[in-house]
């Protein structure tokens, strides 16, 4: 997963401070996975989570991915001296802050949703929790 095109190839690292500004409630499915820590989730981690959820649920249920990796991370080649500019874009990450909903599932039982999201959480480098949908006014 990566953006089709961006205005600039390289980005600054940015700040992690604060809580998630959006996507803090389960809006599409019945159950979701919410972050408890801040960090970067790579496109490979998102794909590994998606595969883990789909393999556990087989053809039952529906899955929503609520994050998208839109930040490029650069890397310099191995055995390169310091300086000489910033490295080339290497991979893409999604910046997540506490409270962000990462994945949602619907049309499955609570136990199946919990097991599927627990398997997906093992692929991430941040702590998460299982949440269910609450009605908002």
Curated annotation (Swiss-Prot):
InterPro entries named in the record: Ribosomal_uL16, Ribosomal_uL16_bact-type, Ribosomal_uL16_CS, Ribosomal_uL16_dom, Ribosomal_uL16_sf
GO cellular component, one term: cytosolic large ribosomal subunit
GO biological processes: translation
Claim: Ribonucleoprotein is one of the keywords in the record: yes
MF terms (GO), sorted A to Z: rRNA binding; structural constituent of ribosome; tRNA binding
Keyword tags: Ribonucleoprotein, Ribosomal protein, RNA-binding, rRNA-binding, tRNA-binding
PROSITE patterns xref list: RIBOSOMAL_L16_1, RIBOSOMAL_L16_2
The keyword Transport is annotated on this UniProt entry: no
Subunit structure, interactors included: Part of the 50S ribosomal subunit.
Family per record: Belongs to the universal ribosomal protein uL16 family.
Function of the molecule: Binds 23S rRNA and is also seen to make contacts with the A and possibly P site tRNAs.
Name this protein carries in UniProt: Large ribosomal subunit protein uL16
Organism the protein comes from: Chlamydia abortus (strain DSM 27085 / S26/3)
